[in-house]
From Swiss-Prot:
Omega-N-methylarginine: residues carrying this PTM: 891
Record's compositionally biased regions (Low complexity): 216-225, 273-285, 1160-1171, 1187-1198
Annotated effect of mutating residue 548 to S: In XIGIS; uncertain significance
Effect annotated for changing residue 792 to R: In XIGIS; uncertain significance; does not affect nuclear localization
Pfam name, any one: DUF4683
Gene this chain is encoded by: AHDC1
Organism: Homo sapiens (Human)
DNA-binding region, residue range(s): 396-408, 544-556
Protein name: Transcription factor Gibbin
Consequence of changing residue 607 to N: In XIGIS; uncertain significance; does not affect nuclear localization
Compositionally biased residues, Polar residues: 166-178, 816-827
């Protein structure tokens, strides 16, 4: 359509004849026809003469100035007609069309032109205004706008104006979007607009090839610039317009001429111009080209016609040499053009007689082919005009590049001889120089080159031509502006051009007519001389020169404008310059890439991919550093090196720069900082960044730091990171650490892009960067948050929590990090990343929260881990929860929630915002979208896709919801969906690439979903992205799923919220990304992590998706959690000594690379699951390797993912690859994967675990602790075993781990890991996501629950219910109210129902995670083991949650809500009580309480719920939970469901943490499934997001976690 409409537009514009217009109406029966018909009608109404008179006079009345100009034009035309029309125009006209007709056409054209000009006067302003409008339109529909804007706009506005703006918009847009092409396009566009402008004229102008009177006007009209210039100089400007038109024509024509000269066949030139025109016209020249031939050809003819053979032909002739040269320069364009020229030209030639007839012309319009032929001259003219043709676009760029060729022709136009010489020189291959003079006499049809040269000469001679020249000049300026200048400059340029033309028009008009304008023009073209002559217009050109063209232009400019003689030499120079210009153009193009981040995102993603090696190298470097620091003396090395890293981070952090590069870096950040191989380096870097950043609160560094720090540091960071490292943040957001590289890898472009996108876009990167660094924490606002960037996220969250007591004490933090366990999911990703990154991050985290780091890093490795882990966890959990919650609120509150979030943010600004976002989320399922991303990812993919798909897909773009931040929330939903993420992941896993791309592209980046998001991400992620658009969100969202949702969405809101959705979006994203990242957190985020991690990671990730790197690296809270998880796991898993971590780090690093891949996979998986489940499925061993690769590595990201998925499926067996199982397995396996990779490092597990944890952030940790850590085998076994065990033993372990073995194992982590895993697995079986969903997701669930739930109908209410406690806090009202009531009720239901649902649905939990889709089975299969026990309970919860998720989403969470509610309050509290007490009762509870108290509002619904109810409930739940992690799990399943079950499992010592984690995971994971679980989870996350909305959200998450 683009092509066609463009072609049509061009055609219509070009043809511009009544028939054409009529025809155009045919094509665009809408607006365009109206104006066109008017013009056409009028022109037809008036005889050609009358038309001429009318144009000159009748039309003049409309523009009195026009009359003058018209009069002048007629004189000019007369001149032109005498010299040019007689020679060229007439000959051409005659050759192609009867001269009489040509005359009539000219007259008519003039009349039309007058009309056009008339409109242009008004249009000028309109154009300027509309320019913006058009710009937007173009932006919205680059091509369509051309077509629609030109056509449609034209009808409303003078066609010229519309075209004009189409031109400007397009060029601007194009420039931004397609710099190189655009450069040509501007000319083309100018020309094209001319066509459209002329279109009205072409009617009459059809036959009047000469269109002498029309020549200037026609040229102006044809040029389309005239409308602008004309409007500008409409009054007296007829002449000026003519000049401008001439200029435009010159600009337009030069290439056309070049093309034609090269074509040397009139037909060829015509088609060539057509081609050129279409391309410029269509933003997508390539798409356009094919059509361009047919479409453009007709317009070409009309173009020639409107130009009035003389004007256009002359100009075209002038341009022809340039065009030829351009073609020579651009063989590609040349070749196609010649073909087009030959074929279309010939067609046109034969039809030219037809073209003569307006009707024929219209027909031609209809028939692209016939359209061209309508006027032999018209066609050539069009061709000239079309010179803009896409092909010429390049050419034009080249020729126009220096505008030397253009300048030559332009100048020549003024003093045509010079241009001719120049053109000749330029078109040396076809030697137009000689042809131009001969061509003048020569018939147009026979020898277009000759005719064109003739025309060129004629214009030189012709005063009228001079007018055209003025126009031409304008064109040059215009074209130049777009080409050289950015959109902004372009506008300025445009204005300048107009002003110049107007200002100089009086003087220069004469000069131009005289031919003196050439120097001016040349100056303008060259930029130098033009500057002298036209300071205004020139200035912009000069700017162009600045763009790198200056030297050449200057050289050309001075010589060329100075002497026609120089033209030859200059022509050579021009040719060289033109050729060089293309390079410059490329440069510009590059610039524009930078300039256009949005487009850049994809490019960046690609770039990232391309630079992956670079990134890897860098990462390797970083890894080495990280490894060294991490391995050697993480505390010592890291602390010292961290600052350097910070500095380095800034380098990297220049994510702006790096972003593109780092897409690898982003990825790397995600990976290095966030995850995997690079994770180490990046973690180091990220960590460093986050470390210093957090410390320094370097907002910018934060970007990188945000990537690393944010990943580690927290949502803010991550969010910051998001922007900072789009890829990185996004990756993290998506997958967390792998996200960056791995994800990018996995998702490949998507993730990186996504990541880039996410951070860049959603995070508002900068905003987040600042925010994250300082903003983030600031976002989080709590000083505490700021205190540790880690805290920033973590800090903010954790810090908020820390403030709460998390930070306050290691214990608190530990507990917090218990949440970290859930964070574990984040950890999954984060852990994976955190293996060392996390480890570093633990340092970092500690750094971030110096306290945390200190004890985390230094002293209490175990405690540190605990504290760290807890810290991370809570932040993660809380953050994630908050994130989800915050986002959720954001979603519902959207602005308000953000406000709420802000409010909450007050305490935990970020979190509150997150909460807001989260809470908001509930409001919109689309909010769910935010949630959905998580949910969608995991659950949404499954559930959301099913349920939320609408929101997911639709709100997917919740863009739909985006409006309300909704993406954020939506993403929150997705965040919740993060779980979905995981599930989606599976889809996405496969889809990953797609989705990643897609999703990512969406910025859903999410694509974390990318995997899940893919499905969703694609569906919802994009929306998230879109919503956030949220491209950032995309990135963030992608965070990726949520990140974006949060980030993008939330980022927007989130961003708004400091949690900026970092928490939510980022976090989620993180979960998503993080989860996706599989970066443990990513993975976790991805999976449940999608959910959970989404929560944690989400939170964190969202912290940034940017965070994910950090989060991953820094882990944000999540990451910290993850790191902590790792650390934390290690923390829990004391044996996960830092050394292990370090060791793991070494493993991790290389493996991290692999992990990266895995992480990518995880990214893919990130569905978290992908990796997570991959690993888990991988049977611990394979999975571990695979998963690890996947999770950690994201090795083949996709491949790995696939493999993992397959294996996972295999392992998953029933669940199949269901993410749930995957997560489940991932819990086992993934830990193995991440952890395994880290293999025995549980730290690895932790780190990886987070990766794993991602899968079972909570469970994972457990698993990781248990499995990998312990054995790595333990985890491996645990992972594998856990996987299986988890499958069976895990289920048992789940129960058993729930028993403390795992707990002991993980301490918390093991429990968490295993239990969590178990729980997670049960939930987590929601593959990593499940974990996220289940265990991991539990928080996500919880967290996400709010999201999911949030999104769900119950989302809000349910959400409230889920967060009933905190609900009140956050906005909890809904949540609270609903949830609360359900809460009470849910316990039973939750227990039974949820449990039940969970058991079967565990998958459901996962289901929405993705497992929900298949996972029920998966979960059932996988989870059943785990779920069997817990599965039943959890299963129920999961099922309920999942169902809720799935069904709840659709269902509206009522049911789920109940369970969730209960779960949340129920298990959540149990989590609090059981977990808190069991695990670090004090930490958990204390932390929780602290968290609670602190977050209390955060509510941590569960906390508050748990707090009062929590304790009781917690107690009860713990029992229940402990008793059957299943039931608790049921409760936890949703929120605590997983959390609870996990909690239950975790109820053991780690329960608090595990529970927390699981809960968090549940919240997180459940985010995916929490949508359903939301209520239950909602209790936690909801609570968090509800209560804390922002802070509570984080806290809530934490709370959920804690609880």
């Amino acid at each position: 359509m683009r092509v066609k409409p463009q072609g049509l537009v061009v055609t219509s514009s070009a043809v511009c004849s009544s028939p054409d217009y009529l025809r155009e109406p045919k094509y665009y029966p809408g607006g365009p026809p109206t104006p066109r018909p008017l013009l056409p009608t009028r022109p037809p109404a008036s005889p050609p003469d009358k038309a001429f008179s009318t144009h000159a006079f009748s039309e003049n009345p409309r523009p009195p100035p026009r009359r003058d100009p018209s009069t002048r034009r007629p004189p000019v035309l007369a001149k032109g007609d005498d010299p040019l029309p007689p020679r060229a125009a007439r000959p051409v006209s005659q050759a192609r069309c009867p001269t009489p007709v040509g005359d009539g056409s000219s007259s008519r054209r003039c009349w039309d032109n007058g009309r056009v000009n008339l409109r242009p006067v008004v249009q000028l302003i309109d154009i300027m205004k509309d320019l913006t409008r058009l710009s937007q339109d173009l932006q919205h529909s680059g091509v369509h706008l051309d077509c629609g804007g030109l056509r449609l706009s034209r009808p409303p506005a003078p066609p010229p104006g519309d075209l004009q703006y189409s031109f400007f918009s397009s060029p601007s847009l194009a420039n931004s979007i397609r710099s190189p092409e655009e450069r040509a396009t501007p000319h083309a566009k100018s020309e094209r607009p001319s066509h459209p402008l002329y279109e009205p004229e072409p009617e009459p102008r059809d036959s009047p090839q000469p269109g002498q009177g029309h020549s200037p006007g026609a040229t102006a009209a044809a040029t389309g610039l005239p409308p602008e210039p004309e409007p500008d100089s409409t009054d007296y400007s007829e002449l000026a317009d003519a000049d401008i038109l001439s200029e435009l024509a010159s600009l337009t024509c030069p290439e056309a001429q070049l093309l034609e000269a090269q074509a040397l066949e009139p037909p060829s030139p015509e088609p060539e111009p057509q081609l050129l025109d279409p391309q410029p016209r269509f933003l997508d020249p390539q798409a356009l080209e094919p059509l361009g031939e047919a479409l453009e050809l007709p317009p070409l003819q009309p173009l020639a016609d409107p130009l009035g053979l003389p004007g256009l032909a002359l100009q075209a002739l002038d341009t022809l040499p340039d065009s030829l040269e351009s073609q020579l320069l651009d063989p590609q364009a040349l070749d196609p053009l010649p073909k087009l020229l030959d074929v279309p030209g010939r067609r046109l030639e034969p039809q030219q007689p037809l073209g003569h007839c307006p009707l024929a012309e219209p027909l031609r319009l209809d028939l692209c082919s016939p359209h061209g032929p309508p006027g032999p001259e018209g066609h050539p003219k069009y061709a000239l005009r079309r010179t803009d043709r896409p092909k010429i676009l390049c050419r034009r760029r080249k020729a126009g590049r220096g505008r030397k060729a253009d300048a030559g022709p332009e100048g020549r136009l003024l003093p045509l001889p010079m241009p001719t010489g120049l053109v000749a020189a330029l078109a040396e291959p076809p030697p137009p120089p000689p042809p131009p003079p001969p061509a003048l006499p020569g018939p147009g049809p026979v020898s277009v080159p000759e005719l064109k040269p003739e025309s060129s000469q004629t214009p030189v001679v012709s005063t009228r031509k001079g007018k055209c020249r003025g126009v031409r000049r304008m064109v040059v300026k215009m074209a130049k502006i777009p080409v050289s200048l950015g959109r902004r400059n372009k506008t300025t340029y445009k204005v300048s051009s107009l002003s110049s033309s107007l200002s100089v028009e009086g003087k220069e008009l004469g000069l131009r007519v005289s031919a003196e304008p050439t120097p001016l023009l040349k100056m303008k073209n060259n930029g130098r001389n033009v500057v002298v002559v036209f300071p205004p217009g020139e200035m912009p050109i000069i700017l162009k020169r600045k763009r790198g063209r200056p030297p050449k232009n200057l050289l050309l400019g001075p010589g060329k404008p100075k002497e026609p003689a120089v033209v030859a030499a200059e022509a050579a120079t021009v040719a060289a310059a033109t050729m060089a210009m293309p390079e410059v153009k490329k440069r510009r193009r590059r610039k524009q890439k930078l300039a256009s981040p949005q487009p850049s995102y994809a490019a960046d993603a690609n770039d990232s991919k391309a630079e992956y090696s670079d990134v890897l190298a860098k990462l390797a470097f970083l890894n080495r550093q990280s490894q060294c620091a991490g391995r050697c003396s993480p505390p010592r090395c890291w602390t010292p090196s961290e600052p350097e890293s910070v500095h380095q981070a800034p380098d990297t952090q220049s994510i702006s720069h790096f972003l593109h590069r780092v897409q690898g870096f982003r990825r790397r950040g995600g990976k290095a900082g966030g995850f995997g191989g690079r994770g180490g380096g990046h973690a180091a870097k990220s960590a460093r960044c986050s470390f210093s950043d957090f410390f320094e609160g370097i907002g910018k560094k934060k970007k990188v730091v945000a990537v690393a720090a944010a990943g580690v540091g927290g949502p803010g960071l991550t969010e910051l990171g998001h922007p900072r490292k789009r890829g990185r943040g996004e990756v993290d957001a998506v997958t967390g650490k792998p996200k960056r590289k791995r994800r990018s890898r996995k998702n490949g472009t998507l993730f990186p892009e996504q990541v880039p996108s996410g951070p860049g876009f959603g995070e508002a990167g900068a905003e987040w960067a600042g925010d994250k660094g300082g903003g983030w924490a600031p976002h989080h606002g709590h000083p505490g948050g700021q205190a540790g960037r880690n805290c920033g996220f973590q800090g903010t969250e954790a810090r908020a929590f820390a403030s709460t007591g998390l930070e306050s004490g290691a214990s608190g933090r530990g507990s917090y990090y218990s949440t970290g366990a859930p964070s574990g999911q984040t950890e999954l990703s984060q852990e994976r990343q955190n293996l060392f990154t996390g480890y570093f991050r633990s340092l970092l985290d500690s750094d971030d929260s110096s306290d945390l780091l200190d004890f985390a890093l230094s002293a209490s490795r175990p405690e540190s881990r605990k504290a760290s882990g807890t810290y991370a966890g809570p932040p993660t959990s809380a953050l994630p929860a908050q994130r989800g919650l915050a986002t959720f609120p954001s979603r519902g509150a959207k602005a308000s929630p953000v406000a709420v979030g802000s409010s909450g943010a007050g305490a935990d600004p970020s979190f509150q915002p997150v909460l807001s976002a989260r809470q908001t989320f509930p409001p919109g399922r689309a909010a769910s979208y935010g949630l959905t991303p998580a949910a969608s990812d995991c659950r949404a993919a499954e559930t959301f896709p099913k349920l939320v798909p609408p929101p997911s897909a639709m709100a997917r773009s919740p863009t739909t919801h985006p409006p309300a931040n909704t993406y954020l929330p939506q993403y929150g939903g997705y965040g919740a969906g993060q779980s979905v993420f995981a599930p989606t992941k599976p889809f996405t896993g496969q889809d990953c690439a797609n989705s990643k791309d897609c999703s990512f592209a969406y910025g859903s980046g999410n694509s974390l979903p990318a995997s899940p998001s893919s499905a969703h991400s694609a569906g919802y992620a994009p929306p998230p992205t879109g919503g956030p658009c949220l491209p950032p969100s995309k990135a963030s969202f992608f965070s990726s799923s949520e990140g974006a949702p949060f980030s993008g969405s939330a980022p927007t809101p989130l961003r708004c919220d400091s949690r900026a959705s970092t928490v939510s979006p980022g976090g989620y994203m993180v979960p998503k990304g993080t989860t996706a990242s599989a970066t443990s957190a990513a993975s976790a985020a991805s999976s449940s992590s999608s959910s959970f991690q989404p929560s944690p990671e989400n939170c964190r990730q969202f912290a940034g998706a940017s965070q994910w790197p950090f989060r991953q690296g820094y882990g944000g809270l999540d990451w910290a959690s993850e790191a902590f998880s790792q650390l934390y796991n290690p923390s829990f898993d004391c044996h996960v000594s830092e050394p292990n971590v370090i060791l793991d780090i070494s493993n991790y690093t290389p493996q991290k690379v692999k992990q990266q891949t895995a992480v990518s996979e995880t990214f893919s998986e990130s569905s978290s699951d992908s990796t997570q489940f991959n690993q888990p499925v991988g049977g611990g061993g394979f999975r571990r390797a695979n998963s690890e690769a996947s999770s950690s590595e994201g090795q083949s990201s996709l491949s790995s993912l696939e493999k993992l998925m397959m294996d996972w499926n295999e392992a998953s067996s029933a669940p199949g690859y269901n993410w749930n199982q995957s997560v489940l397995f991932q819990s086992s396996s993934k830990p193995g994967r991440g952890r395994r990779k880290k293999v025995d490092l549980f730290e690895a597990s932790h780190l990886g675990f987070p990766t794993s944890a991602s899968a079972a952030a909570s469970g994972y940790p457990s698993k990781r602790s248990t499995g990998p850590r312990q054995p790595r085998g333990g985890r491996g076994g645990g992972a594998c075993s856990a996987k299986k065990e988890r499958g069976g033993a895990a289920a048992k372990a789940k129960f058993i781990p729930k028993p403390q073995p795992v707990n002991p194992l993980f301490q918390d982590s093991p429990d968490l890991g295993l239990d969590y895993y178990s729980g997670d697995s049960s939930m987590s079986p929601l593959p990593s996501q499940s974990r996220a969903f289940g265990v991991g997701e539990r928080d996500p669930c919880d967290f996400i629950g709010p999201y999911s739930m949030n999104p769900s109908t119950p989302s809000d209410g349910t959400f409230g219910q889920g967060f009933h406690c905190d609900s009140p806090s956050l906005g909890a009202p809904e949540l609270d109210g609903k949830h609360f009531p359900p809460l009470a009720h849910p316990p039973t239901v939750f227990d039974a129902g949820l449990q039940k649902a969970y058991s079967p649905t565990c998958s459901p939990t996962l289901g929405f995670k993705e497992e929900l889709r298949p996972p029920p089975t998966k979960l059932a299969a996988c989870e059943p083991l785990k779920h069997g026990l817990q599965g039943a309970s959890l299963g129920h919860a999961a099922a309920a949650q999942a169902h809720l998720s799935c069904r709840d989403l659709p269902l509206g969470q009522p049911h789920y809500d109940s369970p969730s509610c209960k779960g949340t309050a129920y298990w959540y509290p149990p989590g609090s009580a059981a977990r808190s007490p069991p695990y670090e009762g004090k930490v958990g509870t204390g932390l929780l309480a602290d968290f609670l108290g602190r977050t209390e509002a955060a509510c941590l619904s569960a906390p508050h719920l748990a707090s009062p109810p929590a304790t009781p409930k917690a107690d009860k739940e713990p029992l229940e939970m402990a008793r059957p992690p299943g039931p608790p799990r049921g409760p936890a399943a949703a929120a605590a469901g997983y959390g609870c079950p996990l909690l239950s499992d975790l109820t053991l010592s780690p329960v608090p943490r595990d529970s927390l984690l699981p809960l968090q995971d549940t919240a997180y994971r459940y985010p995916g499934f929490m949508p359903q679980a939301h209520p239950g989870l909602g209790g936690g996350p909801k609570s968090g997001f509800l209560g804390p909305m922002a802070e509570p959200h984080p806290e809530d998450t934490f709370t959920v976690t804690s609880l």
